[in-house]
Amino acid sequence: MRYLRMLSNSVIAAGVASGYLTVLVLQLNPSISIDPATLLPLALVFGVAYGANLTVAFYALIVMRQILAVEVLSPGWLSVRLLSWLCTIAAGAASALMWLNFRGFGDVLDPITRDRMFVGAALVTASAVIFLGLGLAHLGRRGGRISAAILSTTMVLSVAAPIVARGPARQPPLPMPPTATVIDGGTSASDSHIRMLMFDGASLEVILSSVAAGRLPNIARIIDKGSVLHLATLRPTQAEPVWSSIATGRYPMSNGVRSAVVYRVLDGTPIQLLPDYCFTQALVTFGFLSEQQQTAADLLARPIWNILSDRGASVGVIGW
């Protein structure tokens, strides 16, 4: 029975950790509604995909502790001593993930989403501190009913509170519909031309090294007679959201293309953005999530060439 009780604590801690990952997906995708029809499939996928692996990892930690410790631990089905430390690990790792994703995606999130994600990450960080305090308070002694109540309440609130802070489903701010513009007949008459050459994946380091080797003489003349500078990119660093932002002049949340594909859980609610640093692409590889390619219909903002055409400029687009 001892090993079954060790397993039960591992399953509980893994469930809490899977809940944190579900919260992170909800934070990055404010358009996902919070209702049982949406949350249950999402929690089920993360519980199966991550919960099973985390259960094995937590169980291995407990076994290692049993081997190395002087006193063999005989935990209860819900052990305050065990779960306080396992939840410290889970909440600490989850808070680090949330802060890393907040830093990585913060520039492409709208202010409301960014602020709510900040609050959620702070709440999980505070939960990790509480779990750590419980663990330190019960070194070498069993927990009582009060400790178990505090632990259970913190586990529930550490998942529920960030969801409440995230708020109900909210559509990101979209661009205003175009208004009719009266074009002067002489506006489009001009002898000047603008040509934009855009190469996918051609970083400035690659171009400059090729120019130095004499392989790009035409681009070398452009560099010699023009200006050259580095540009920061967006996250995720995928062609579709980056080029959509270039074409529309709007961030991904406003132009409708936030990643290369749209992900679906059990062919249900679409997920536009997956978090980084937690192997979420493996969910697609192993069939937990399905992919749907982005199309031109997903672009909610107007590209610059359409805007210029409305104002009388002659525009030609090749290879878009």
Outline where the language-model segments fall:
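Alpha-helical transmembrane segments
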Residues: Y20-L24, L54-V63, A126-L139, A160-V164
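Active-site-proximal N-terminal segment of extracellular/periplasmic enzymes that hydrolyze or transfer
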Residues: G167-H230, T237
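Long, well-ordered early-domain segments
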Residues: I219, I246-W320
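Extended, compositionally biased non-globular segments that define protein topology
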Residues: M1-M117
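Short, structured active-site-proximal loop/turn typified by the sulfatase FGly-forming signature C/S-X-P-X-R
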Residues: P41-L44, E205-V261, S314-I318
